[in-house]
């Protein structure tokens, strides 16, 4: 009988206790997105914050409060909209990270009057849903994968840069340096400026940001003026000859084409039409 009692105790410890513990804490949350899935999932808009006359931050809810989106740092999602009976898709990079956001994800979207998906998102009301799938993309940032990142962003192209910078800022073991040149038309167009400055304050020895405006609205503007040219890149970003550096580019097509040419003129290896993680110049 004593032996049977001992066996019963062992069974309780090995089998019953873990099951009870699992029941109490609930199942481990899994990422909502699955790269192996090719179907779209729906997520409701739960909050909208207007940033400028045509740009807002949209927060979409996940199924459960402890869910994470499941998006590797630097990758994007695909959003589908049905426009006049035709399915249209566009790619967007969330500004939120799995490491600091649960139960929702955030998108920075500039809505254009003649746009398709961006216009649809701009017209969403609280409770309306979007359809997304992912993650997608060839860039996946990992701690200290580069010694120095040079970033060139225009408009909402700041989204992937902000995401990567936030990941570096939150990681006490990440020593990657970041130099960002952020171009916009007017000062009011500078998106996430307070958030970016907060990241610089977290790691001032690693982060440097220079703002460029096409048309400054005040005479005492202390940032750069004009387009992001070869000379601007040479002055503010790491040189091609430096060890383990990479240039990241995201923004309007005309700006991207121009700065890509400039990087080649400055000695960087010519970027491929479809960028790869190992490229010296990567275009999102």
Curated annotation (Swiss-Prot):
Induction comment: Protein levels are highest during exponential growth phase and lowest in stationary phase.
FAD-binding FR-type domain mapped to chain residues: 38-142
Gene Ontology cellular component terms for the protein in this record: mitochondrial outer membrane; mitochondrion; nucleus; plasma membrane
Pfam (any one): FAD_binding_6
Keywords: FAD, Flavoprotein, Membrane, Mitochondrion, Mitochondrion outer membrane, NAD, Oxidoreductase, Transferase, Transmembrane, Transmembrane helix
The family this protein is said to belong to: Belongs to the flavoprotein pyridine nucleotide cytochrome reductase family.
UniProt function note: NADH-dependent reductase for KTI11/DPH3 and cytochrome b5. Required for the first step of diphthamide biosynthesis, a post-translational modification of histidine which occurs in elongation factor 2. DPH1 and DPH2 transfer a 3-amino-3-carboxypropyl (ACP) group from S-adenosyl-L-methionine (SAM) to a histidine residue, the reaction is assisted by a reduction system comprising KTI11/DPH3 and a NADH-dependent reductase, predominantly CBR1.
Record's protein name: NADH-cytochrome b5 reductase 1
Lineage per the UniProt record: Eukaryota, Fungi, Dikarya, Ascomycota, Saccharomycotina
Gene name of the encoded protein: CBR1
